[in-house]
Amino acid sequence: MQISYDEGNVVLTEVRDFDLAQTLECGQCFHFKKLAEQEYAVCAFHRLLRIRQEKDSVILFDTAMQDYEMIWRDYFDFGRDYGRIKAALLQTDDTLKEAVETMQGVHILQQEFFETLISFIISQNKQIPHIKKIVETLSERFGDDLGEINGMRFFAFPTVSQMCNVTEEDLRDCKTGFRAPYIVDAV
């Protein structure tokens, strides 16, 4: 993989074994919006990222190289050799063969612990669109404003300190339902 910086954008070329849509939409994270085909707004680590994939190139728009190196490289797990891992799994594990062949481009996102924990609690008996809506509502209501992309406002997932005084009733207003007491306990 080659990395360059062009007019305020980090550009990755010769990217192998990565599919942005598969990675974001497979159900491991919920704090993103699809903007266009293979283009997304992603909220993570108190940052807002517009990212697009074009074949074997990935563009991180309006991103400092330092943010790529300190946040996004690890978040998207670009440093791991997924081709080697897949080759090993295909040779040794028949059970995983179909999954590996079906989801060739999924990377394991290195997410913030607190957001992952709360999202996991929310995910009980929920479909992905509803989980995403609850995460978005919690972020709008209790998180910090991160900015705007294409006329849409985005908010960071709230921190533990931002959630420490949130009540079960507040959480139920965000449509968490029976999960509210578990979220309060987790905070």
Segments and roles (model prediction):
Residues 1-187:
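HhH-family (HhH-GPD) DNA N-glycosylase catalytic core used in base-excision repair
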